[in-house]
Amino acid sequence: MTTAAPSTRDTILVVARQRFADRGFSGTSLADIADEVGIRPPSLFHHFPSKVALYRAVLLDAFDDWFALMDETMAAEPAEGWPQVERVIRTAFRFFVERPDFVRLARWEALEGGPILVEELATVLRPLFERGAGFLEKEMDAGRVRRCDARRLVITGYGAVLSYLSDAPLVGSLLGEDPTSPVALETEQEHILDLFRHALVPGAPGPGPEPGVT
């Protein structure tokens, strides 16, 4: 059985996602998107009434993928304590590695303010944010993780994973290595997990020694 060819609308979204990820909203031309898709610019407006509408669809589609993955991850067992925290961090790290377009879109939106207002994006993200913070608070009450500011910890975790990848060129220059090599990615993931394990798990040993220190 042959796979159905993607619709014109789907093709527009794929091309637009890459363009917006590479150049941001302001630096992206609808004419360039239409040209790459292979349609005339006016035809694009049959599918999306404006550049803002197209950008909004691209951004919300990207975050829908993120929400679906987090829902699946947080529903897995065991759904408590450090094992759940570790699973969420590993899943987030893998998603960001596999979806560099998402990383760049998120950074462009944060930098530009974007035509999707920050308030709207915050409204979309809030249920997942509150779910994560609520989980941590429940685990603190049960004594399975150390007491901390759960809401700020969720933001810190998101930033720790996202920033390493969004700032990869700078990170590479500072560390003197390719930050996206398999070894570097594994090292960074374990480093982040080590820090959060030390911060959250009662009685956990301190972070491991720095490379080259015995």
Give the role of each language-model region.
Residues 1-7, 11, 18, 39, ...:
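N-terminal intrinsically disordered/low-complexity leader segments
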Residues 60-65:
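Short, basic, alpha-helical segments at the C-terminal edge of helix-turn-helix-like DNA-binding modules
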Residues 97-119, 168-176:
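Amphipathic alpha-helical segments used for helix-helix packing
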Residues 107-137:
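A contiguous binding-surface segment within folded domains or other stable secondary-structure elements
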Residues 57, 71-104, 142, 150-157, ...:
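Hydrophobic alpha-helical connector segments
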Residues 8-11, 15, 19-53, 57:
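Helix-turn-helix
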Residues 91-94, 98, 126-142, 146, ...:
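C-terminal peripheral helix-coil segments that are non-catalytic and often amphipathic
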